């Protein structure tokens, strides 16, 4: 904290943490979220065939994190839909993205320089949602660290954790795409961010919430902008995760491969052994036939 104070970032961090996200940053969040929905196979056909189903999918993309968090906390899952301004903004973005004449709106927001700006703005909303989720869970469960992490993670992950439900609305069923089994970078980052904010809320992390919001938003924005610009699907955490998992949980894949190789070599040995045995039996039979002919 003394180092951060020496950098004179106090005012900047506090001002950034108090920066309102509505409507500018929220609109950016809706644009990028619904843009990703349009990238999904069959999403455009669905919007023409069943606009209601397409709109519901768009609302899940925009507000799925609130719905799932409310369900986990025992609150009404449709509570957030009482925010008329947000619903109208998200609906307007959905309509323009799918039904704007000549696809003008889609082409504008897909323009890479503008898209990178919108991606960075979306991460501002994501981190703010994680922080608010931790605060909300702490209000209900003061010492429930796991609950705080879970709610913060859900708030930050958005619709990713509800991807199977969203796919059902589109008439698609892909259980192998379960986000928990194959976490994307935003889902992993939201989990790690939720852990950091929970530690800060419990006063185990010696940093103010304003600083944590500022630096974690900076990290998320830089990573997502870089990944979007380079069309990368890798994770910056991959190197650390592989090392930590190897130490804590062992090289599961390597052991499995070694086990498989052992069986493979054993099978090869059995096959070669049986082949040699068959050749020996064949030669023995040939010798017996020759002996009979000679007799």
UniProtKB/Swiss-Prot annotation:
InterPro entries: TRIC_channel (IPR007866). GO terms for biological process: regulation of release of sequestered calcium ion into cytosol. One of its GO terms (cellular component) is sarcoplasmic reticulum membrane. Residues 259-286 have a biased composition (Basic and acidic residues). GO terms for molecular function: identical protein binding; metal ion binding; potassium channel activity. It is a multi-pass membrane protein. Homotrimer; conformation seems to be controled by binding to diacylglycerol (DAG). This is Trimeric intracellular cation channel type A.
